[in-house]
Curated annotation (Swiss-Prot):
E.C. number: 2.1.2.9
Top EC group: transferase
Listed InterPro entries: Fmt, Formyl_trans_C, Formyl_trans_C_sf, Formyl_transf_N, Formyl_transf_N_sf, Formyl_transferase-like_C_sf, GART_AS, Met-tRNA-FMT_C
Annotated (6S)-5,6,7,8-tetrahydrofolate binding sites: S110, L111, L112, P113
Top-rank taxon, per record: Bacteria
Encoding gene per record: fmt
The keyword Iron belongs to this UniProt entry's keyword annotation: no
The protein's name in its UniProt record: Methionyl-tRNA formyltransferase
Pfam family, one: Formyl_trans_C
Similarity-based family: Belongs to the Fmt family.
Keyword annotations from UniProtKB, A to Z: Protein biosynthesis, Transferase
Family annotation (PROSITE patterns): GART
GO MF term list: methionyl-tRNA formyltransferase activity
Length: 311
């Protein structure tokens, strides 16, 4: 039985962890995840999805703010694990930890060498990619630059967003890891080096990237909105107040970018630099998320053709 330490934090990671737990070939010695955080308006302390899974299965949990130089690091190294598996962990592993195990692999949510970094699924959608995927790779000191053990892809559909793609890729990554790890550990599956010249990067989304620019094409705005749903959520401004947009459609239409060019009882069409967008699910400042129909029947009843978003 291969003794493993698992490292990760979000739901994506938890799905991969469950796959390892359910496989009798592996013994989970410990889980390393981010500390519990205060979330939401009420600032309730919440544990990570990975911690929840670990506690359900009575697996010891370590939660260092930063693994390198921590007391937890020494405890983790003393466990005498065969290897480490990470998935969306978000920290570099110290060299001495990597040197202390026989193997260390990462489940990364992109088709490397494209989209190294912390937000690969967001960028795949924002950039209008037609497919996304996962790569099982060896861990090295450079971010997501290790040799590739296996890759798998899946189409990005028109109704996909970050949430749906996270779910799809978590399952894809889990299954690919379970399928290929035995052959990798036995030496039958040889890793392949990445072409570093083709590497692209996906740093964490900034607040400036969340802001919609209606001079862009309708298709680009559509991709930006779904590439930030359900987090961090794209936004614009209306009458000087922040206005979040969860869903919209790219359609035909002409007008000045940001201008309302059509309004009915259940639709609101806004012009872009090329084409137009039909708003579907929105969230005015300080209000809950709602359909555009509910918005127009209430808070947005006074919006008229000729008004502008983005101001």
């Amino acid at each position: 039985m291969t003794k493993i330490i698992f490292m990760g934090t979000p739901d994506f990671s938890a799905t991969v962890l469950k796959g390892l737990i359910e496989n009798p070939s592996y013994q989970l010695l410990a889980v390393v995840t981010q500390p519990d955080r205060a979330v939401g308006r009420k600032k309730e302390i919440k544990m990570s999805p990975v911690k929840e899974v670990a506690l359900e299965h009575h697996i010891p949990v370590y939660q260092p703010e930063k693994l390198s130089g921590s007391q937890e690091l020494e405890s983790i190294m003393s466990l005498d694990a065969d290897g480490i598996v990470t998935a969306a962990f978000g920290q570099f592993l110290p060299t001495k930890l990597l040197d202390s195990v026989t193997f260390a692999v990462n489940v990364h949510a992109s088709l490397l060498p494209k989209y190294r970094g912390g937000a690969p699924i967001h960028y795949a959608l924002i950039n209008g990619e037609e497919e996304a995927g996962v790569t099982i790779m060896e861990m090295v000191k450079e971010m997501d630059a290790g040799d590739m053990i296996a890759k798998a892809s899946t189409p990005i559909l028109e109704d996909d967003n970050v949430g749906t793609m996270f779910d799809k890729l978590a399952i894809l990554g889990r299954d690919l890891l379970i399928k290929t790890l035995p052959d990798y550990l036995s030496g039958q599956l040889k890793p392949v080096a990445q072409n570093h010249a083709e590497a692209t990067f996906s740093p964490n989304i900034t607040s400036e990237q969340e802001k919609l620019d209606f001079t862009k094409s309708a298709r680009a705005i559509f991709n930006q909105v779904r590439g930030m749903n359900p987090w961090p959520i794209a936004h614009t401004y209306f009458n000087g107040e922040r206005f979040k947009i969860y869903e919209l459609l790219a359609i035909e239409g002409q007008g000045a970018p940001g201008q309302v060019i059509e309004k009915t009882k259940d639709s609101l069409i806004v012009a872009t630099g090329s084409g137009a967008v039909s708003l579907r699910v929105v969230q005015p400042s300080g209000k809950p998320k709602m359909t555009i129909k509910d918005y127009l029947n209430g808070l947005g009843r006074d919006i008229k053709v000729g008004d502008y978003f983005g101001q």
